[in-house]
């Protein structure tokens, strides 16, 4: 098992929950037959202790222990404000 903690960067799509945000993380996937690269989006719930994020912000999140049923990521920093 790897000791490296996973970190991702994405855009905040929702901050309506208390101390929680929803982050959309985009990745490129190559189509198996045609070879074209396609954008795929994953929505991740992350913990925002200080409620400092707004919709549209670019943020860095890292994996942590499960904090709730759907939340196992936490906010590291805000890269740029919307």
Swiss-Prot record:
Gene Ontology MF annotations: rRNA binding; structural constituent of ribosome
GO CC terms, sorted: cytosolic small ribosomal subunit
Keywords carried by this UniProt record: Ribonucleoprotein, Ribosomal protein, RNA-binding, rRNA-binding
Pfam families named in the record: Ribosomal_S17
Gene3D superfamilies per UniProt: Nucleic acid-binding proteins
Superkingdom field: Bacteria
InterPro entries, per database record: NA-bd_OB-fold (IPR012340), Ribosomal_uS17 (IPR000266), Ribosomal_uS17_bact/chlr (IPR019984), Ribosomal_uS17_CS (IPR019979)
Function: One of the primary rRNA binding proteins, it binds specifically to the 5'-end of 16S ribosomal RNA.
Annotated family: Belongs to the universal ribosomal protein uS17 family.
Subunit text: Part of the 30S ribosomal subunit.
NCBIfam families xrefs: PRK05610.1 (NF004123), uS17_bact (TIGR03635)
Protein known as: Small ribosomal subunit protein uS17
Organism, scientific name: Shewanella amazonensis (strain ATCC BAA-1098 / SB2B)
Lineage: Bacteria, Pseudomonadati, Pseudomonadota, Gammaproteobacteria, Alteromonadales
């Amino acid at each position: 098992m790897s000791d490296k903690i996973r970190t991702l960067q994405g855009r905040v799509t929702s901050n309506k929950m208390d101390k929680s945000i929803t982050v959309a993380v985009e990745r490129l996937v190559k189509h198996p037959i045609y070879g074209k690269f396609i954008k795929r989006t994953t929505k991740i719930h992350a913990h925002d202790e200080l409620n400092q994020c707004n919709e549209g912000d670019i943020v860095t999140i890292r994996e942590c222990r499960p904090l709730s049923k759907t939340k196992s990521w936490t906010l590291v920093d805000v890269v740029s404000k919307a």
